[in-house]
Amino acid sequence: TGLLEKLIPSAKDGGAAIFAPFYCEYGVNIHFGKGCFVNYKCTFLDCAPITLEDGVWVGANVTIATPCHPFLFDERLPQQYPDGFHDLEYAKPIHIGSGSWICSSATICGGVTIGKNCIVAAGAVVTRDVPDNCIVAGVPAKVLRKLDEQDRMQVWDTYMKNEVPMSERERGRK
């Protein structure tokens, strides 16, 4: 068993394909469903649980960060404490629903739940929950639109024109 499987037990046995370099804070708070993919240079700060359901894709250079800090300046200022240091960090879990795709250089902030079959655009910063079947983009990320059957058919047409084989799941069959 490799170091990664020791840190993240759910990464073995088909749980995830993870490309190096991969950075995490603890590893033990990261939970992968089956068939997840994590591209290179991703950072998972797992002070609280990070859960990726089945089939989640994570693009290159994505940050998934559960830590949070006080909003007010005087609460963050360590010089005000006698020891010169005070750790006011806390963490909130992150949950990403099955079939979602987090595109390159996106950031997912603590406390966020991303629904099933969502697309988070490249460079987006997700600070709020995302409903199922949505595309979000921007800083902060906002819902652009819902995904529907027409989107599924467009993907199907693209695959057929390029003669790319699709799995039964991608065709929407059981």
Identify the meaning behind each predicted range.
Residues 75-88, 123, 165-174:
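Short flexible/disordered coil segments
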Residues 1-15, 139-174:
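Terminal amphipathic alpha-helical/low-complexity segments used for targeting or macromolecular assembly
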Residues 108-137, 141:
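C-terminal/domain-terminus segments
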Residues 79, 134, 156-158:
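A generic membrane alpha-helix/interface feature
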